[in-house]
Amino acid sequence: KPGVIDTDFIRNHASQFEQYKQLVHDTQWLSIEAQSGLTQQEITQAADVYLHANSVICTWAMGITQHRHSVATIQEIVNFQLLRGNLGKKGAGLCPVRGHSNVQGNRTMGINEKPLPGFINAQEEMLNTTLPQTPGHNVYHALNALIAKKSKVLICLGGNLAAAASDTHKTFQAMRSTELNVQISTKLNRSHLQIGKSALILPCLGRTEIDMQASGEQFITVEDTFSMVHASQGDVAPISNNVKSEIAIVGEMAKSTLGSKIIDWQALIDDYDKIREMIEQVLPQFSSFNQRLESPGGFYLGNSARERKWHNPAKRALFAIND
């Protein structure tokens, strides 16, 4: 129907629309109803609401993210928004709801089992050394590796893996298969009961607690879903002077196992500003990191899709083709 598809947006900003259009035309309603659990009438009613909205935001949470077909499902949500140009338009867009306040920040900092070559290369240049290029495990593969005895040690920095992973039985089995299970935590949780051969519970400071190191009180940074980066500093006295920060715990583990020839781990523990100075050497969007944090509310990292700039070889938004 005329006016249903934003042809100007697709012509100027998108690719693979014709292939996607053909796939949709070839898909039978019986198949759609069987997969969705909804009737054609119900879907048509929802589509009518969408068609009469000038701007639309699609929001989803962990039920989609941890779905068996999560990637394809999210790609279809993106396709849905591309059809009417609901990216890079005021009041429109995509809004994933994460299960933790700093999940997006973790990804930005490179916590990824398959980091991009450019990210690794930038670290190698900064450190003047060679780093491993072999991909690691995502959660699913990590659990399977523990069960198969291909991995022996599990170190969890925060969170509650036993309750958060989607297959509870397999998660329990994997954690109990460990030679060593280390939990760095602010509070007791179910993961501490899945022990394995040996287990350590390492209490750490929470974000509300004062973090005092050699150079004085420290703060960390977080990135929210809307790409805002800001400082987070506790103001409550720690429950004990013996409780260490996450950074101190990880830094001391690294110092004990890797040594300090390449990285001065103790210097990073003593002054978190030095960590941020290293980050800005690897990630250009964090230039003048410490200085920009002085602005009230932090700073905006930017979102290329919001500006309708597409950072891929085609330089265009791509309709995903999922059979």
Predicted features, each with a name:
Residues 267-323:
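Long, low-complexity segments enriched in small/aliphatic residues
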Residues 1-90, 97-278:
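Non-catalytic alpha/beta scaffold blocks inside enzyme catalytic domains
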